[in-house]
């Protein structure tokens, strides 16, 4: 984890600001997803809940499984900077076995089962208080996984709340209020 990431997480946790995590560059070699979740939990003191789960990584990255819908979003390798085309299939669609190697899909499903048994549970209150971070996997350079991240953020994030300042409580609905940074 980068030093600036650690500092940002520390400030967010101190102020009980929700943290949404996007694990990037799944289309490049890197750490195993389970060890990344362990690292976030151990080093940042945050519980994690994977919203989606990668099928493979690096050259073998094939897409993600959405845990809630049980839908597979397949990754189509695009040139750098270009948007990846996404293909959505249900987990039980027979065509999936033609598009994704069995061992990659089996490994992803085994890891998902492990998360269901031993991982954190989805808890919106804990997300809002900054104690649990929803985790998404993808490749920002090709925009793969970015849309589901943004959609889930809109569903899970709470609206603006009043904040204390040197001048007292600032209501986000005041006409002259423009933002809180």
Name each model-derived stretch:
Residues 1-181:
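Structural and coupling elements of P-loop NTPases
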């Amino acid at each position: 984890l980068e030093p600036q990431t650690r500092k940002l997480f520390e400030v967010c946790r101190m102020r009980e600001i929700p943290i949404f995590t996007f694990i990037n560059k799944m289309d490049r070699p890197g750490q195993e997803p389970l060890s990344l979740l362990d690292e976030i939990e151990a080093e940042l003191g945050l519980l994690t809940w994977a919203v989606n789960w990668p099928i493979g990584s690096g050259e073998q990255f094939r897409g993600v499984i959405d845990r809630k819908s049980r839908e597979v979003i397949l990754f189509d390798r695009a040139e750098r900077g270009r948007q990846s085309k996404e293909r959505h299939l249900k987990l039980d669609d027979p065509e999936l076995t033609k598009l994704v190697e069995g061992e990659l899909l089996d490994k992803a499903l085994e890891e998902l089962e492990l998360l269901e048994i031993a991982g954190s549970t989805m808890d919106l209150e804990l997300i809002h208080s900054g104690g649990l971070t929803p985790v998404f996997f993808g490749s920002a350079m090709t925009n793969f996984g970015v849309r589901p991240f943004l959609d889930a953020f809109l569903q899970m994030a709470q609206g603006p709340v009043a904040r204390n300042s040197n001048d007292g409580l600032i209501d986000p609905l005041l006409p002259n209020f423009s933002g809180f940074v």
